[in-house]
Amino acid sequence: MRFIILGIFAATVLFSCAQAEEAWPRFRGDNSSGIATGKAPPIEFGPGKSELWRVPLASGHSSPCVVGDSIFLTTYESEQKKLAVVCVDRHRGEIRWQRVVPATQIERGHPSFNPASSTPACDGERVVAYFGSFGLICFDLSGRKLWEKKMPLAKSFAGNATSPAIIGDRVILYRGNYVDHYLLAVDKKTGKELWKVPQKETFTGEMACTSCPIVVGNRLIVHTARSVQAFDIATGERLWVVKCATTATSTPILAGDEVIVAAWNKMGEPALRPPFPTFEKLIEEHDKNGDSRIGHDEFPVLWIFHRPDGIEAPMNGGTVSFGHADRNKDGGISAEEWPRTIEELERFRAGYDSHGMLAIPVDSEGMVAADKVRTLETMSIPEVPSPLYDGKYLYFVKNGGILTCLELETGERVYRTRTGGRGTHYASPLIAGGNIYSSAGDGLISVLQLGEDPEILAKNDMKDGVYATPAIVDGTIYVRTHSALHAFREP
């Protein structure tokens, strides 16, 4: 694996800024690892506490991209239907410049989606942003447009939240929707296409396009719909493929000589598939008129799949329809109809394989056999947040603030606990100063210590929703809420 380790350092030199510890150049920082180096940020913070500044922003779920004295984000003003790339002065908390991105139509998606969900990438000379409503656009650090690469309006159920990565002399983008589905490399100076690899998997409504490519030596690793793939960064040649039951919502991380991926799907574990009641139970609890049938007004909400720890989120599951269960359309569900309905629904569920936290050898080749991939865990897999690795332990947080810690070498579970956060989690956790920073969608940011003892050190209420993953640079944590960007630092 020597070539891989050397390649990591080479790639870091190529695409990172000279001020490595002073930068957070893409989604989740250096190579999307989620690990901040240097001075630790505050443990306790919030509006009015350890707060350097706060700047109001238009809506958006993109994370802060921090390079030098600049912070780059994307925004969306819904009333004007206006997309923009924004540069904020890192020290003063003032908007330095804002450039409108001239989209003719605005991408639609899940109710939790925002058209400005993609995090910009910066190499110290240029900043590149992606919008499913427009395509790629590049500016220099003063806000002068350098190039653009327009793309058709992305159309999907979830919406495009994928983020570009600048690696060496190129920009890498994974784009997936009903219109097109591919991995793309363009010249970072001109926007000229270098290669494009169409994806063989047809993009469906159950798939997501939110992951960011990472680099290991000469290999790009991409979490794509129903697979994890590696590509040669120079040519786009597909080097290996791992087929898995995943919607591809999270970003992979590197852990030694393995790639760690949270492969999740909506029916991938028992907690997401509530049991169906027997007909006798239905009658006992819901037959209000005593006719030994279940009428339309008596039929309860029954989940085919369900996110029990994200119940407040819109469209958080799928339910059994009365019309499907009332097979003869006589207005009532009988003792003969219900078992047949359950049988069909269970067959439908059986079409979804179990998901899991996967460990894939970086130097795999071709179509990777299942026995070459380690499944570290199959329960409490996060849908959106990406995992973390501290050199020994693997951490991941799912909806409900459920934090799991595994020892990577053995795959043994060290603990499973709650962070204090509740509800849906969209932002990915981060490591800084020997602690984990975990953000809940309702704006509670919990800080827990690393290692075998998961003590909760603080619960910081931002008083606003947090869907964007924070950025941590030189002892400052930058938190984007639904309405503003905050900077927190110890006095």
Residue ranges of each PLM-predicted region?
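Bacterial N-terminal signal peptides
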Residues: I5-L14
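Noncatalytic, solvent-exposed loop/strand surfaces
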Residues: C17-P491
